[in-house]
C-alpha cells in the first residue's frame, strides 16, 4: 500500500448502505446557507454508480415539475448526511441513461421481489 491509500482509508465512510442502479433512494444532503445549515432531501432513481474507493460517485435522477433533474454525489462525501434506500429496482443494465428519454409510466422501474 502506498501513502495515498492510507489517506484515502481514513476518509472512507462505513455507514453507506448497499444500493445499485435502479434503486429509489432518499439522499439527505447538508446545505449551508449563510450561517445556517440544514438538511435537504433529494429523492430519485439511481441511474449510475461509477469509480471506486474515495472517488466513487453515483447519479440520482428525478422529475421535478415536468423537468428532469440529475445530481451526482460522491459516495464518501461529508456533505451527505445519510442515504435511505426506499425500493430496490429490477434492471438489467448498469447505466440507466435510457430513462432520460422516457416519461410517465414508461419510466417506471419494476421492483425486485
From Swiss-Prot:
SUPFAM superfamilies: Translation proteins SH3-like domain. The keyword Cell cycle does not apply. GO terms for biological process: translation. Pfam families: Ribosomal_L19 (PF01245). One of its GO terms (molecular function) is structural constituent of ribosome. InterPro entries: Ribosomal_bL19 (IPR001857), Ribosomal_bL19_CS (IPR018257), Ribosomal_bL19_sf (IPR038657), Translation_prot_SH3-like_sf (IPR008991). GO terms for cellular component: cytosolic large ribosomal subunit. Keywords: Ribonucleoprotein, Ribosomal protein. Belongs to the bacterial ribosomal protein bL19 family. This protein is located at the 30S-50S ribosomal subunit interface and may play a role in the structure and function of the aminoacyl-tRNA binding site. HAMAP family: Ribosomal_bL19. This is Large ribosomal subunit protein bL19. It comes from Mycolicibacterium smegmatis (strain ATCC 700084 / mc(2)155). The gene is rplS.
Amino acid at each position: 500500500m502506498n501513502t495515498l491509500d492510507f489517506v484515502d482509508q481514513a476518509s472512507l465512510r462505513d455507514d453507506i448502505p448497499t444500493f445499485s442502479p435502479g434503486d429509489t433512494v432518499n439522499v439527505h444532503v447538508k446545505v449551508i446557507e449563510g450561517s445556517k445549515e440544514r438538511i435537504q432531501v433529494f429523492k430519485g432513481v439511481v441511474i449510475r454508480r461509477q469509480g471506486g474507493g474515495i472517488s466513487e460517485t453515483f447519479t440520482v435522477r428525478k422529475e421535478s415539475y415536468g423537468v428532469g433533474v440529475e445530481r451526482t454525489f460522491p459516495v464518501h462525501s461529508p456533505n451527505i448526511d445519510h442515504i435511505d434506500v426506499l425500493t430496490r429496482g429490477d434492471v438489467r443494465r448498469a447505466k440507466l441513461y435510457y430513462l432520460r428519454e422516457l416519461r410517465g409510466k414508461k419510466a417506471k422501474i419494476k421492483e425486485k421481489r
